[in-house]
């Protein structure tokens, strides 16, 4: 296991060397990442972090350490595209503290980089006597290169459709459209597919969500930059919350990014790799 807390940018590479993630802490103490496939940016520098009621973990951070190790798993599932899966990846855990309290770690960002997928999630650490917190916003972003087009399912507004259950049903997909829109004003439902130059593709989704966290969507900020969005306030007739109340320590669901040629998109098993 390697530990290199002093570096400002670190690279995490897949076992076959084709996929790489570059982790950075930029001006203002903001954690960011990039994703490369065969040396080309498929996700440009994008934000990371969480906002909670016990602290803003999107800025003002210092890096305490990063560790890397190889991980592997073999599992079988019925009725999916591949009956026996051999999963291999490089795992990196970056630990951060607030700049004004550098002695106390507050959050880990955990990355898994396999031969066709990148996945990341957050772990909010215990804060002295604090045992619970509310996650109010996730800063996780996905900045896609210029010229990218999209294949997306717009999320409908709440309290419409059959028995007023929207957005529980799929809406018509838009195909090969330029990026820069926000669907019908409420973003997009996962999974979200994007096409780039040189026949490269990116599929963004989530996995590992359970009843202890909110299901999320993808919002467009501007141009080719998207970010994770929490539920709309009117969903389920207003019952439930648009934020996540969690017991500490807490790990969030995985954000997944499948990259490369279209075959990688079709063959990915990342939704099961991380939850088997």
Give residue spans per PLM region.
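N-terminal accessory beta-strand-rich subdomains and adjacent acidic, glycine-rich linkers
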Residues: 11-275
């Amino acid at each position: 296991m390697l530990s290199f807390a002093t570096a400002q940018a670190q690279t995490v590479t897949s076992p076959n060397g084709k996929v790489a993630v570059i982790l950075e802490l930029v001006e203002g103490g903001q954690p960011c990442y990039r994703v490369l496939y065969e040396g080309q940016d498929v996700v440009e520098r994008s934000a990371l972090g969480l906002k909670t009621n016990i602290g803003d973990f999107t800025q003002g951070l210092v890096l305490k350490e990063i560790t890397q190790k190889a991980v592997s798993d073999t599992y079988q599932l019925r009725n999916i595209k591949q009956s026996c899966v051999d999963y291999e990846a490089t795992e990196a855990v970056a630990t951060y503290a607030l700049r004004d309290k550098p002695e106390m770690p507050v959050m880990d960002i955990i990355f898994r980089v396999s031969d066709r997928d990148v996945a990341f999630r957050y772990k909010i650490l215990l804060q002295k006597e604090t045992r619970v917190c509310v996650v109010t916003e996730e800063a996780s972003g996905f900045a896609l290169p210029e010229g990218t087009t999209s294949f997306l399912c717009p999320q409908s507004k709440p309290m419409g459709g059959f028995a007023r259950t929207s957005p529980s049903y799929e809406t018509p997909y838009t195909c090969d459209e330029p990026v820069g829109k926000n669907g019908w004003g409420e973003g997009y439902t996962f999974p979200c597919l994007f096409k780039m130059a040189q026949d490269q593709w990116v599929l963004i989704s989530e996995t590992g969500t359970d009843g202890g966290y909110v299901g999320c969507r993808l919002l467009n900020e501007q141009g080719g930059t998207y970010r994770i969005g929490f539920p709309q306030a009117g969903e389920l007739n207003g019952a439930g919350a648009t934020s996540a109340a969690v017991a500490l320590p807490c790990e969030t669901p995985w954000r997944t990014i499948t990259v490369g040629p279209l075959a990688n998109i079709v063959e990915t098993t990342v939704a099961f790799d991380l939850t088997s």
